[in-house]
Amino acid sequence: LMDLFLTQNYQITFLSTATISENSFDLNSKNIQFQNIVLNDNSFDDLIKKLSPEIVIFDRFSTEEQFGWRVSEQVPNAVKILDTEDLHFLRNAREKAFKQNKNLENSDLVNDVFKREIASILRCDLSLIISEFEMNMLKNQFKIDEKILFYLPIFAEIKKSEIPFSERRNFISIGNFLHEP
């Protein structure tokens, strides 16, 4: 997503409550500025006003909950975009149904995460949706105005392997298995 904005000659400032570590992506390599921010702190108001962005992208609905109102107050003309990646309320409902060994039902979708995420979508000027299923569900089932939704499937470059699938060996996955299905 950042590459998309860079190709359009946007100057990007990446704001995060997380600190940069040796494992962080090198934003400087792409000429992207980094600023550390603090939750529930007026210093964010001063920073966002100083930066005066035309566009603000929230990487998930909980980020919009924390900072969206401050953006609206300090830079009211900024376009607020929610990058949903995937809908957390849907993921949450699927996880619960899976753990209960049952099929997902419409009633499973309406939960606290649903209310928060839909509210965030409605507060933003635009929400990026990566799944056609999610796009249709938001438009048809939950009657979210199509004008505030933008279907943007994952656009990572896929490199073809020179080794046929049947001949591939020795795959290792490293992680902590904390991300639910």
Predicted regions: what is each one?
Residues 48-66, 81:
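Short N-terminal targeting/anchoring amphipathic segment
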Residues 42-51, 162-164:
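Short amphipathic alpha-helix with an adjacent loop that forms part of the alpha/beta core around
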